[in-house]
Amino acid sequence: CVGSRDTNRCGNGYCSSVCCMYALKESMIAKEHAHGDLDCAIFNMDIRTFGKDYEKYYLRARDKEGVRFITARVHTITEVPETGDLILEYADNSGAMKQETFNMVVLSVGLQIQPGTAELAKRLDVKLDKYNFVESDPFTPVNTSRPGIYTCGVLQGPKDIPESVAEASAAACLAGAELAEARGTEIAKVEIPEPIDVYGQKPRIGVFVCNCGINIGGIVDVPAVKDYAATLPSVVFTDDNLFTCSQDTQDIIKEKIIEHQLNRVIVASCSPKTHEQMFMETLEACGLNKYLFEMANIRNQNSWIHSKDPEAATQKAKDLVRMSVARAATLHPLHEKKIPVIKRALVIGGGVAGMNAALGLADQGFPVVLIEKEERLGGMANHLTATIEGADVGSYLEGLIEKVTAHSQIQVLTRSLIVGFSGFKGNFTTEVLVGPGMYERKIDHGVVVLATGATEYRPKEFLYGKDQKVVTQVELSKRLKEKGAKDLNRVVMIQCVGSRNGENPNCSRICCQSAIKNALHIKKHQPDTQIFILYRDIRTYGLLEDYYTEARKQGVIFCRFDPEDPPTVESSEDGIMVTFKDHVLDSDLRVSADLLALSAGMVAEDTEELASIVKLARTAEGHFMEAHVKLRPVDMATEGVFVCGTAHSPKLLSESISQALAAASRATTFLSQPELTLSAVTAQVNADQCASCLICVRSCPYQVPRINEDGVSEIDVALCHGCGVCAAECPAKAIELNWYEDVQILSKVDALLEGVM
């Protein structure tokens, strides 16, 4: 919290949202690179690992990697003249002064808006808040005070990469709606050179070895790997680069392909999952078929897991490159198929996220079918009263429902259940049982947006359900709206109920601000009410920190508790008796409360059946898993399927709205195209060898193979996902997967075992 959560030194009262996580990351990387026992300590006020699966990362750092976490603000740093070491002085939880000596001190520096950026916003007549972030409404998070100008990323408020990427897509969605009528009028066609005919040519392989900064180069002897590659058969050019994925290096690769007449290209770097497509496009720009490309993953499969043995990592990198060279020599061009796109979207889930996604698509001119399993739209928002900023959720929800149901491009199906799903990107078919009569309907659509939402955890602990004086924060909000706070003299709130535990290790993100919102509401209408908030870490990230500060000013008492020694709750005639340990007094406190409010976490809706029908990956907690946490935060691994809102992970209403618009924006990139390209990596059947044994039919996770009228297996390449299960299972070797043919796989195996057998 250097430069954040500090109104005394720098005036930045907000939390910068990213500092805890990058301190965690850097400490773990430091321990990996130290090649020995390195003591890493993180001094903190609160650990704010509130993102999706961030808490698991924190637990790994603390419990497995041995990073120490000290809850304290450092008072003084003094240098030891003789050694240059640094002495840190701080007060521990009991108030006692402590000292520790370190070789290095790293400051987790926060984020702030540059003066030039603030000046630009003012020239554009865009309103800023007191910290120079763009003012926005919780229900229109990427809109600014000036119509037609949108905001995203840190300019809107402190946030990390996934939220910034999603907000960028959300802003693009709203801008796209304004420009919908002009779609397609300003497209510049990318000219791709005539493909080079490589049939009959001997392989001429180029190998580009990447340092990936220090991720690879800090462990592997990259120049040695490059020199080794030059000795391999058919390799005519080698090079090493700091970052092979950079635009400069892409241009160099193009130059070298032409200069050395390369007809196969290998990049030895990171994961093909994130970078393969980019390198393939580089080949296409030179006229080379994109499937004449091979990638050796010498980072994830090598330097990261052998970081303590550089010599072995270097040898393994050579092995991986040798294997890739052997496979590259067997590659041949493959050709992709074009398919038309059904210009309709299916949105599953009629909560705030689902409705905003539907509007984001419909306002750009695309028909939308919105499916909701309940009778009423709104989802969890039907149980919410107001945001922490004071915005009325109920009136917003009514307006949103009215807008959706009245939209000419949106068809709403309530009380509907999905029972079947088939197809591929741009051409899906979903079977739905609609209404009380459960009549069957088939919907053809080009994309899917998942917005199935989440629900409040129903506590099993702290006497919830056994004593009427124990409620959740959602129930308390409703009570305050209906009855006010007149009868409340003392209230206790317990945080992290149903979150950050064995069953649900993640932070539910909303609980701290929900507690503070209700506490401020009570204090506003009943200032003399005593309020105790028992917490593990207060996670009012970003601009929410101001509300935490205000709650303290209003006299709300915050007491930290250890999860190993949680509060205990008993019913009594006078109310609810809560016992907890106060770390400052180092003794147990007993508080008799009129009401106990549990900050219950957020749990995913039951998504198991839907995930099974649509064939989608989920986290252990039941949330849908995105394709890439940072680069593709709303895309699913299945192309044409997108996720948003609390179906993705717990989040605030404003964040769900941003992510819904982002999913709509990403879906538009499919719907706006006249046709889509199918991957050439599909399974092919040799009918002469097929024994009609049905093993491929039974083993395919997507139910693609079928036995045709000739009695042999047939695989529709448009439906094939290229997973290769059928090719691996076929006992007659009648099925082969393009780009993973037997000769290509076996060439790698032979190269690996070279000199061994």
Go through the PLM ranges and name each one.
Residues 1-757:
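Residues forming the flavin
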